[in-house]
Amino acid sequence: MAKDENKDRIYELVKQRNEYMQQGKTLEEVKVLKELAELTEEVYGEESNENIQILNELGGTLKYTGEFETAVNTIIKAKNIIEKKYGRDIVPYATCNLNLAEVYRFMKKFDKIEELYLETMEIYQKNNLQNDYLYASVCNNLGLFYQDTGRFQDALTLHEKSLEILEKLPEYKLQYATTLSNMVLPYLKTGEKEKSEEVLDKSLRLIENTVGKEHSLYSASLNNMAVQYYNEGEFKKALKYFEASAKICRRSFGENSGNYKSLLQNIEIVKERLGKNE
């Protein structure tokens, strides 16, 4: 009887989690995922496919709230179960790699990240997923890694590949908008200011029309707009958009989030520049 009750609770939590995802409420989503992980292991077993999936999803989401150690341990646990049961050439193993690489990217532990991304791409290719959303995701995320390490032209090549795939998958319009937003900085850095403005404007409109102005993805686009204004020397406008982005980011991810801390640093930098210009 208790097992049936737990299954009912799992169903309720999955529904609740999906609502929080749609609303961009990551702090609330993490709480739900943690309870889901406990119940899923209890109901289906530690080595079940259900448990593998929830561990992977929990680990991938924890990076946004700054719970890096737990994120790494959770994903590695899922990877080990998959490897033991199925080997390394299946899609869930690749997705674990992708999530682990993203956690390391948020932690700025860059030494093994590229290897993880490339292994992920290879596994997706072996499984004929070159035109799938999953392949678009790894292209986009590897592009972000190249941005973090100053390889902006390489980043653009990968973001463009991601867009090419997502254009044919209309159900992923939010992910399409996110990829556009991710292209703002590399276009700026490679001297293509008009393209940078074009993708920023398009991404903002798509995100606003899809999930509204309170979503974490809208926060990311506001951050990109602030970066544009900062690079143009319009520090008051940059401050306005950094602060608006930080407000949404804090609600979505909490004060321990790396994104939120980065925004606070940017706000201080802009205030310092404004002080010098007065």
Tell where the protein language model's regions lie, with residue ranges.
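TPR/TPR-like (Sel1-like) alpha-helical repeat modules
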Residues: 235-254, 268-271
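Short coil/turn linkers that connect adjacent helices within long alpha-helical scaffolds
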Residues: 2-4, 42-46, 84-88, 126-130, ...
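TPR-adjacent "capping" and linker segments in tetratricopeptide-repeat scaffold/adaptor proteins
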Residues: 1-12
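Conserved alpha-helical positions within TPR/SEL1-like repeat arrays
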Residues: 11-22, 49-64, 91-106, 133-148, ...
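Amphipathic alpha-helical segments of tetratricopeptide repeats
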Residues: 37-42, 79-84, 119-126, 163-168, ...
